[in-house]
Amino acid sequence: MKVLEFAFSGPDNAYLPHQYQPRCVCYTGTHDNDTAAGWYAAAGEQERAFAERYLGTSGAENIRQALLRAGQGSVAELFVAQMQDYLGLGSESRINVPGVAEGNWRWRLLPGRTGPELAEEIRSLTSLYGRCPWRPEPVEGTEDGE
């Protein structure tokens, strides 16, 4: 089990995607971790700086996308991301805080929160990294791309 939110203490960290062995599962975070946006907001200066350097980007929205790409593109046999990470939601959407008895397991994906754009983002990433059947992206100016 490789949790990307645990990865950014330095280049030798076993949770960094370049350290993975194929027979593992990669997660952006688990039900016991903050969302990717919440993690980034709360990360210490050194951890955030290393994550930005490793992922080649900065800013919460860019980091969210980079974490999803890093996980999808890793050699992990499976990749799992919370819907909150695809939606870019912050700590208010965290599922569980270990050791806290109240207020956990309340987050719900409400109708209208997703749509064709999100479905296309997920399909595009999973297809690009070979995690679902590949189909070419339409090219503008061609028969399929109008």
Give residue spans per PLM region.
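Catalytic cores of glycan-processing enzymes that make or break glycosidic bonds
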Residues: 1-138, 143-146
